[in-house]
Amino acid sequence: MLSKVVLLVALAAICGAQGASYAGRHTADMDFLHKQKKIFDLLLYVRQADLSDAEWYDVGRNYDMESNMDMYKDKNVVQKFLWWYKQGMFLSRNAIFTPLNSEQKYEVRMLFELLYNAKDFQTFYKTAAWARLRMNSGMFTTAFSIAVLYRPDTKYMKFPAIYEIYPNYFFDSSVIEEAQNLKMSRGSSVVTGMNNIETYIVNTNYSSKNMREYNDPEYKLDYFMEDVELNAYYYYMREMLPYWMSSSQYHMPKEIRGQLYYFLHKQLMTRYFLERMSNDLGKTAEFDWNKPINSGFYSTIMYSNGVTFPQRNRFSSLPYYKYKYLNVINALEMRLMDAIDSGYLIDEYGKKIDIYTPEGLNMLGNVIEGSSDSINTKFYGMYDILARDILGYNFDFQNKNNLIPSALQSYSTSMRDPAFYMLYQNILSYFLRYKKLQPQYSQSELQMPGVKFESVNIDKLYTYFDKCDTLINNAVAVENFKGGMYLRLKARRACMNYERFTYKININSDKETKGMMRIFLGPAFDEIKHDMVYLQKYFYLFMEMDRFAVTLRPGSNSIERQSSESPFTTSTIMPSDIFYDKLNKAIGGSEPFTYSEKMLGFPERLILPRGKPEGMRYKMFFFLSSMDESNTKSYEIPLYGKMTLDDKVFGFPLDRPMWAWNFTIPNMYFKDVFIYNRPNEESMNY
């Protein structure tokens, strides 16, 4: 029972709490408002440590950590941190930070532990202000953000979106340069006057606009791979449960981690495949460590210190300086395959641990990610991190301050590289093999007696390209903090969107009962006509779109569901300038300030693949299962708040092969749908 509930928790974390019920929004009191403003201010213009008019500046400059040792839960954490700092051993302020480097991982964990161990909010704030002035900005941003998520006294508090903190990770260097030019040519009057807020728009394109000579078909998907909110979503999903954090120490249910790692990437890869279909690209190419990599990586995004991200040409072989990792990666792959086929992992004491148990998937996920909860990191290594290092093609530097990480070594840029999808297709193949070796579902597990789908009708499905603006103030340097608040620089880009639609479902029931409706979207292939055979072959290519509880009455039941109600998704994150204005008005007493326990989900506007102008066929799969309210459980996870979940596993019933049965399943329903893309030349400026 526990494992089933946990699987749902993992899905909830991925997509916004599938089938979960949330507490409502809250109205902030004055204590919450002042804390929220302090947190937000610390991440504005985070690369500048010279903003002497900011509140945190004097706080951080005057704070003496050694004199306040009693204000931390664990003095050893403070002593260790200060020793490292005094020895000058931390990453330099202008170096490039990546949590996937072993030295930098150790350092960001020390900074996080320092912030987390502060006994009260004031000590936490003073410590953060001190670190804001002295530590590497990327390391500070990561450690501080995670501390805010996990500290009880900062629960539900928001920070600027990562694309607003580091716009250079999301927009090409030409955009950053134009923003800086605008600031130099027009921003000075804003800073000195500070009477009016002035907004400037910088138009931007996707990578394919600047690289047609490379003719790489993978970049037909640049509007998806480089989507700002999608990349931010992935960043937060990985940062929410850092691989270096021990779940037993930080109120992070241990049984979540492995499933979350798997389900996050399963959902993303399925959604990516559906987008490939809209562009006639077929399945993602497989790769071999000993052969050239098909896809290149071409981008002009750059790090904050002006260094461009390492590139990779099409069909390029592994560089010689990565050869030393080949034996290691091949050994790790062999050990993973042996574990799946034999049915057991080997822990650090040499004991065999059965993985074909309710806890097995979680253990396998931890091992592949190489998280702190892996049962044997020494033997199974950190496959995910090592594979990213090899595929990134970046140079190996002995000095951490000279390191230039690849796009794959930053969670906020990983999805821009086509190799990301090749890598995770390979990783998911291990999980798929594991799933295929599990027993098929029985009739009693699948059927819902007395319940039958009568019909399903759906509005016509349309996608289009809209204009999206992103605040990029952090791309420029400002003379002072207050003046920076009166300048609004925004990058405008075409972004895919969809027209909201309604599901109209008719179900017949012979009794009053409660159930859970699951809706999936998958590809439509013509070679297989029988639905059961189709699911047997392509079950793993379906993405779960929605999930909600229903109460059925005897007889015919009509159910209407809006696409925007999906708990998997969230609408566009409120821009920082609007959020900050609302926050200040609330502090001034002119209007109330409300906040939600749920702050993140998959971008709603990307819930549908693009389709085609003439329409493209996909398949929707509807499944209704019984729900026992006595088997529900509640959990609370950073960014997602409190969730109440049922007892079915993630992706049920498409989490494993669906064999052709000798019985009927009236509580499932297939429907062909067509997705139409409305061309918009004005918005599609790429």
UniProtKB/Swiss-Prot annotation:
Where does this protein chiefly localize? secreted
Domain Hemocyanin N-terminal stretches: 32-155
Q: What induces it?
A: In 5th instar larvae induced by juvenile hormone. May be post-transcriptionally repressed by miRNA.
Subcellular location field: Secreted; Nucleus; Cytoplasm; Cytoplasmic granule
Organism domain of life: Eukaryota
Where in the numbering of this chain does the Hemocyanin C-terminal domain appear? Answer: 440-676
List glycan-bearing residues: 205, 662
Q: In which tissues is it expressed?
A: Expressed in the fat body and secreted into the hemolymph (at protein level). Present in trophocytes and oenocytes of the fat body (at protein level). Not expressed in ovary or testis.
Signal sequence residues: 1-19
Q: Which GO terms describe its cellular component?
A: cytoplasm; extracellular region; nucleus
| A molecular function GO annotation | nutrient reservoir activity
Name the UniProt key words of this record, in alphabetical order: Cytoplasm, Glycoprotein, Nucleus, Secreted, Signal, Storage protein
Asked whether the UniProt record includes Signal among its keywords, one would answer yes
The record's annotation in SUPFAM superfamilies points to: Di-copper centre-containing domain, E set domains, Hemocyanin, N-terminal domain
Domain Hemocyanin middle, by residue range, is: 161-431
Q: What does this protein do?
A: Storage protein that may function as a nutrient supply to compensate for lack of dietary proteins during metamorphosis and egg production.
Q: How does it assemble?
A: Probable homohexamer.
Q: Say which family it is in.
A: Belongs to the hemocyanin/hexamerin family.
Q: What is the additional note?
A: Hexamerins are evolutionarily related to hemocyanins but do not bind copper and have lost the ability to bind oxygen.
Q: What is this protein called?
A: Hexamerin 70c
Origin organism is Apis mellifera (Honeybee)
